[in-house]
Amino acid sequence: VTARSEYRTTRNLSLNISSYQLVEAVSNEYVIGLGYKFTEFNKVLKMKQTKDFSNDLTVRLDFSYRKSQSLIRKIEDNFTQPTSGNIAKTLQLSADYGLSKTLSLRAFYDLQINEPLVSSASYPTSNSNYGISLRFSLAQ
């Protein structure tokens, strides 16, 4: 079993002296990931076992939540206005199965959801990707 968690933050400030404005860009992101490795998964599939290779299945699940926004602070008027920003949620699920020393099979699903914080900037979108890949490795 593997587990991970991350917290990332960024903040950029830009001062414009001629217009008395401070532009602030802030981003906060949380990431949570889980993984599990099923050793000798071919026993579950009731397949013939090889002597020198263990057919392992590795499953991973990652979720991230990121909020980013840009603000214009007018120093002279003591006024703050959001100009852009969004909330991005990402879900990634993958399973890797070793068929042999050089051949592996991978299935994956990715989901990305973007929601704007400022309604005039954009509209909510979601993208999903899924698929199966077969990898052949020449290195041993």
Question: What do the PLM-derived regions correspond to, one by one?
Answer:
Residues V1-Q140:
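Exposed, low-structure sequence patches enriched in small/polar residues
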